[in-house]
Amino acid sequence: HLTEQQLDWTSDNWEWSKWSIRRQVSHLASGLFVWLLHRWGHQLFPHGYAELKGLDDHLLAPEGRWLDENKYWDLSVLLVELGRAMGVAKHILESETVASMRQKELIRTDTQPHWNQFATLHNTGFRWHDVNPNISYITLEATFRHIYFGAITHIYNIQRLKRAQGISA
């Protein structure tokens, strides 16, 4: 088990070490909630989230990159939320086919500049608007690919944070 100090350790030495292990875990959960409920929810759950049993009550931090740290701080609570978020992903994947995921498309009107780099990872399912550089389109299939790549990155960062503290990864 990690101590609170180990969970919250950060460093300015590397870009990947600016978020603690706790924040990495929290971001894994919030990322799933943001993508699948906030961004895709109106298409995937047009009648609300009742079928998801209480998943309409999660709160994001004001920064929007992780869960509200006033409510979701303890690692055990974060892991429950991560499990709930993964349950949403599982529910969607069980309800969709590859073909249906390729047909569903989300219009993003506030696409951040770092998506220029992310776009290179998506040979299908992601495209830019012809004129407006802030608008992009992403399919549900590409969204799950993005979530997968993000999860690998954050899990790897957790391992690096542990190693940087002299903890076996």
Per-region residue spans from a language model:
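Hydrophobic packing residues in well-ordered alpha-helices of helical domains and bundles
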Residues: 21, 75-82, 144-147
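Short, helix-capping/interhelical loops that line the mouth of catalytic, cofactor-
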Residues: 31-102, 163-169
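A hydrophobic membrane-anchoring alpha-helix module
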Residues: 141-166
